[in-house]
A protein has these predicted regions:
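Extracellular, repeat-based ectodomains that mediate carbohydrate processing or recognition
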Residues: 1-206
Length: 206
C-alpha cells in the first residue's frame, strides 16, 4: 500500500483548545477541511477518486473543549491520484484563513433564488443538523465505459416549510475521467410534495 495525503492539515495531531495562529498575528486562524462525509471510487484503470464535503472550522475559545463549524459552508471537494499529494504550506493563504490547494470544488448547493448567497429560513438555526456542508454526503459510481457519476445531498434553498429548508439529492457526471463535470441535476424533486422531502445519504451502485 502507498499512502497519499490529499489534504494535509497544517498542524499535526492538533489538540482542541490549542488555538491555531499559523502566522503568529495574535488572531486565531480559520481552516478549511472536510466535513467528515466522503466516498472513494476506484475507476476502471485502478485510479482512486475522492469526493467529500467542504467545511470551515475555528477553535477560538480555548476553554470550551470544542471547535466551531460553519453550516453555510458550501462545496463538494474532489481529488484524484493524478493531482498528487497535498503540498500546501502551513501558513494562511488569505488573512487568517487556511485551505488546501489540492482538492478542487466540482459542485455546490445552488443559488436558486439568485440573491448571491445560498441560505434560507433556517440559516440562523433550526436546520437539519448533520454537521455537513451545504453540498455533502457524496456517493460515486462508474460505468463500463469510464463515465463517473456522483450524487450528493444539496441544501435546496427555495424548498421550505417556513421552518426548515430541505435537502435534495443532486447528480453530476464526468465523461473525461474527472477533468470536467456537468452541472448538478436534482433527481429527487418530489413535486407532489412541493419538494418538501428531506433527501440525504443516497447510495449509488459502484
Amino acid at each position: 500500500w502507498i499512502r497519499t495525503t490529499f489534504i494535509d492539515f497544517p498542524v499535526d495531531k492538533y489538540s482542541l483548545d490549542s488555538g491555531l495562529d499559523l502566522d503568529s498575528t495574535g488572531t486565531f486562524d480559520m481552516v478549511y477541511s472536510t466535513d467528515n462525509y466522503g466516498t472513494v471510487l476506484i475507476d476502471n484503470n485502478d485510479k482512486a477518486h475522492i469526493f467529500t464535503g467542504n467545511m470551515r472550522y475555528l477553535d477560538d475559545d480555548l476553554a470550551d473543549g470544542v471547535s466551531s463549524w460553519f453550516p453555510l459552508t458550501n462545496g463538494l471537494l474532489y481529488w484524484n491520484e493524478d493531482m498528487g499529494a497535498d503540498t500546501t504550506l502551513p501558513t494562511p493563504q488569505d488573512s487568517d484563513l487556511w485551505y488546501s490547494e489540492t482538492p478542487i470544488v466540482i459542485a455546490q448547493a445552488r443559488d436558486l433564488n439568485c440573491d448571491i448567497e445560498v441560505a434560507g429560513y433556517d440559516s440562523t438555526g433550526g436546520y437539519a443538523l448533520y454537521y455537513a456542508s451545504l453540498s455533502s454526503m457524496p456517493s460515486a459510481g462508474i460505468t463500463s465505459s469510464g463515465d463517473i457519476y456522483v450524487t450528493f445531498s444539496a441544501y435546496t434553498e427555495d424548498v421550505d416549510n417556513s421552518i426548515q429548508v430541505f435537502r435534495h439529492v443532486n447528480i453530476i457526471r464526468s465523461l473525461d475521467g474527472g477533468a470536467t463535470w456537468s452541472e448538478p441535476i436534482d433527481i429527487t424533486p418530489h413535486d407532489i410534495w412541493n419538494g418538501q422531502q428531506e433527501c440525504v445519504f443516497a447510495s449509488m451502485v459502484k
